[in-house]
Amino acid sequence: MSADRACLKSYTACFAIRANAEPGILPRLIGLFAKRDLVPAAVLSRRFGDQQLAVDLQIDGIDRALAELIAENMRQMVSVERVLLADLPAELAGRA
């Protein structure tokens, strides 16, 4: 395995999304990964208030350019209010 590939596998892209609490929003968000043959390492969804949803998604081994593209696709969804993207070393994401 190349050094670049090993480094890529040691990082996790973390997406923090705030959206309207609509029934179809979770499958649409996760679908952005599925159509790229990616499976999230972690998904956490929390509803707050009557109409708000906070979603945290973590994806291991994704490069920054693809993560930014997916974040931009999320931002274009009507129900999505905000998307934050961060890179975490795998050990900080809870997986060593």
Show where each model-derived region lies.
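A conserved regulatory-domain signal marking ACT and ACT-like small-molecule sensing domains
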Residues: M1-A96
